[in-house]
């Protein structure tokens, strides 16, 4: 099951990967700067609407996955929507924890999860395009097969029963 919270080992491992440049600028970044009122409102909107959008993405992904579960290719966009919803909810949760300043792990977590959400949306869009193209190709193939089958069943002048209609009109 995908958790909305990262475990502590993952957070510690990520913090250890900071480059020297990030470590040198850390004291400057640790200063507590208050954000403007519009930035605080934006964080509030991200927290509120991000959570709602994340829940809707998870629900929509579940429905897409269940509706096309017959094929693995069809289920891939649904799974990607679920993953996108989880990362959007994580980003919204981090935005709610930021409380007016983006310093510390809340701001980093929000931006990291939002970046992952954007990547998942790219993969979702690409897989949806591929799925639609495959669907169009299959639909064209089915229509061609139906057309060939209908053409084969159409009576022609070579049919032995056609002599009834050649000389005498059916309705007089």
Swiss-Prot record:
May I have one GO cellular component term?
membrane
Topology versus the membrane, per the UniProt entry? Single-pass membrane protein
Q: What is the protein's major site of localization?
A: membrane
Q: Which keywords are on file for this protein?
A: Membrane, Transmembrane, Transmembrane helix
Instruction: Indicate, by first and last residue, each region the UniProt record lists as having compositional bias (Basic and acidic residues).
Output: 1-17
Compartments annotated for it: namely: Membrane
Q: Which domain of life is it from?
A: Bacteria
Please state what the protein is called: Uncharacterized protein YwnG
- List the taxonomic lineage: Bacteria, Bacillati, Bacillota, Bacilli, Bacillales
Name of the gene this protein is made from: ywnG
């Amino acid at each position: 099951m995908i958790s909305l919270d990262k475990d502590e080992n993952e957070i510690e491992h990520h913090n250890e990967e900071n480059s020297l440049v990030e470590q040198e600028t850390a004291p400057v970044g640790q200063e507590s700067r208050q954000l403007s009122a519009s930035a605080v409102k934006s964080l509030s909107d991200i927290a509120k609407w991000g959570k709602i959008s994340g829940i809707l993405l998870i629900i929509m992904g579940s429905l897409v996955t269940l509706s096309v579960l017959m094929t693995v290719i069809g289920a891939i966009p649904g799974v990607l929507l679920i993953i996108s919803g989880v990362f959007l909810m994580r980003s919204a949760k981090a935005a709610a924890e930021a409380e007016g300043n983006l310093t510390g792990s809340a701001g980093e977590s929000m931006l990291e999860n939002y970046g992952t959400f954007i990547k998942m949306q790219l993969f979702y869009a690409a897989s949806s395009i591929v799925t639609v193209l495959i669907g169009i190709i299959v639909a064209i193939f089915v229509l061609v097969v139906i057309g060939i089958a209908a053409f084969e069943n159409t009576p022609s002048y070579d049919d032995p029963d056609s002599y009834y209609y050649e000389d005498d009109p059916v309705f007089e």
